[in-house]
From Swiss-Prot:
This is NAD kinase. InterPro entries: ATP-NAD_kinase_N, ATP-NAD_kinase_PpnK-typ_C, NAD/diacylglycerol_kinase_sf, NADK. The lineage of its organism: Bacteria, Bacillati, Bacillota, Clostridia, Eubacteriales. It comes from the Bacteria. Coiled coil: none annotated. It comes from Clostridium botulinum (strain Alaska E43 / Type E3).
Length: 284
């Protein structure tokens, strides 16, 4: 790999410490000297077509933001290096950087495609299309009443229920908000979409996993109270009553570079379920 870029969150205080260490190790191990550093907030406005690899330095939030802002024709894989708190989406921890770069040079790694969502919504009488890597959530405001939801799958009515909200999730996002609301873990290499209710008061809506090419239409009614559309837990948009939100698979996937010893179930145990100690030493 000749051209490697690094995306950083400019609001984090590591620009002169961890960043310099990462650049030095890349230069020494990968024999790459011209390393571009990018502001993760400006990714959408940059020409990254020459990159062979984009390293995202930060936590899950930084990687989610970069994934949404990348243009659909971006072809290079992403290597997430976790220096945040959780790092479920990251390929490696910062402490494993040197070993990871050596594996990169010996091609002991593989590109995994992660499905993304496209959310179409009417904002101020203008149709907007927004990408999501984890999930699209529609929920009531802080002091609002319950929301009445109508959910259609491929133009067929699936459910009508009243509750606090609902989550439409990718397999990658199944370990995030969807999991907190009672949704299942879904292996991230699959291409399916899950719908999970949030505090379903009527108990008439059950979580469902749909095929990846399904089109989901959501109508949210709240009698004039606040309704919010939230993308990956980072972008919030206040919706009008009776808003229609359409969610489907994005045509382009995110390419994540993972090493061959990557263990999805270990990530779940250690970073989501926090029961790594109970599983230590257990073998088949």
């Amino acid at each position: 790999m000749k051209n490697i870029g690094i995306a950083i969150n400019p609001s984090k205080d590591y620009k002169n410490t961890i960043l310099n260490m990462v650049k030095e190790k890349i230069e020494n191990i990968c024999n790459v000297t011209d390393i571009e550093v990018y502001n993760s907030f400006d990714i959408k406005n940059l020409n990254l077509s020459s990159l062979d690899l984009l390293i995202v330095l930060g936590g899950d939030g930084t990687l989610l933001g970069v994934a949404r802002e990348l243009e659909d024709d971006f072809k290079a894989p992403i290597l997430g290096i976790n220096i945040g708190n959780l790092g479920v989406l990251s390929s490696i921890e910062i402490s494993d950087l040197e070993l990871a770069l050596k594996k990169l040079m010996t091609k002991d790694c593989k590109v995994h495609k992660r499905m993304m969502l496209n959310c179409e919504v009417d904002i101020n009488e203008s149709i907007k299309n927004i990408k999501a890597l984890n999930e699209v959530a529609v929920a009531r405001g802080t002091l609002s009443r319950m929301v009445k939801f109508k959910i259609f799958v491929d133009e067929k009515l699936y459910a009508i229920f009243k509750g606090d909200g609902l989550i439409v999730s990718t397999p990658t996002g199944s370990t995030a908000y969807s999991f907190s609301a009672g949704g299942p873990f879904i292996c991230p290499d699959l291409e399916v979409i899950s719908i999970v209710p949030i505090c379903d008061h009527t108990k008439s809506m059950h979580p469902i996993v749909l095929k990846g090419d399904s089109t989901i239409k959501i109508i949210a009614e709240n009698g004039g109270d606040q309704i919010y559309l939230t993308i990956d837990g980072q972008r919030a948009i206040e919706m009008k009553d009776n808003s229609v939100i359409t969610v489907k698979k994005n045509p382009k996937s995110l390419k994540l570079l993972l090493f061959n010893d990557y263990d999805y179930f270990k990530v779940i145990r250690n970073k989501v379920l926090n029961n790594s100690k109970e599983c230590d030493g257990e073998e088949i």
